[in-house]
Amino acid sequence: INLKAIAAMAKKLL
């Protein structure tokens, strides 16, 4: 998992 994947997931959760 990279930062972009984390950012995308966080964006969905928020």
From Swiss-Prot:
Family per record: Belongs to the MCD family. Mastoparan subfamily.
GO molecular function: toxin activity
Modified residues (Leucine amide): L14
Keyword terms of this UniProt record: Amidation, Antibiotic, Antimicrobial, Fungicide, G-protein coupled receptor impairing toxin, Immunity, Innate immunity, Mast cell degranulation, Secreted, Toxin
Main location: secreted
UniProt key word Oxidoreductase: no
Protein name as catalogued: Mastoparan-like peptide 12d
Compartments (UniProt record): Secreted
Biological function: Shows mast cell degranulation and antimicrobial activities against the Gram-negative bacteria E.coli ATCC 25922 (MIC=3.0 ug/ml), the Gram-positive bacteria S.aureus ATCC 2592 (MIC=1.5 ug/ml) and the fungus C.albicans ATCC 2002 (MIC=12.0 ug/ml). Its mast cell degranulation activity may be related to the activation of G-protein coupled receptors in mast cells as well as interaction with other proteins located in cell endosomal membranes in the mast cells.
Tissues/organs with expression: Expressed by the venom gland.
